[in-house]
Amino acid sequence: MLKAGNTLYMPIGEIYRKPHLWALLCDPIKGEDKVLIVNINTMRKNADSTCTLNVGDHPFIRHESFVNYANSALVSVEKLEDSLSTWRAEYREALKEKVLKRIRQCLLVSPHTPFDVRNIWLKIMKNYD
């Protein structure tokens, strides 16, 4: 069952690309059956440094990485479950609570977070301290 803190290893978007680690920021939204997700990339020049992750923050992370808020999205639970059942996505270890909290806090700080994602998060963040 998908829930806040889960991580998935899957490609970005509909067109096949190299898979990345994705983090679910919330439980499925009631009435919509969707979750808010962000992906984590290897640190590179000019990357969004609002929220950086390092070795120890998650077992999958082997070098400095960043949360790519520009690719954050609201995704249907059905779509993610379909990807999991057809092996286009794989579960990875859940995020530590303190890491999940940091990623959530930085979502509204990052200048790269899409406006629609900001608005969605503002509506649901009251459920997550």
Tell me the role of every PLM-derived stretch:
Residues G5-T7:
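Loop/turn positions that initiate beta-strands
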Residues D57-D129:
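C-terminal terminal-subdomain/extension
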Residues Y9-I12, Y16-F60:
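Compact nucleic-acid interaction/catalytic patches
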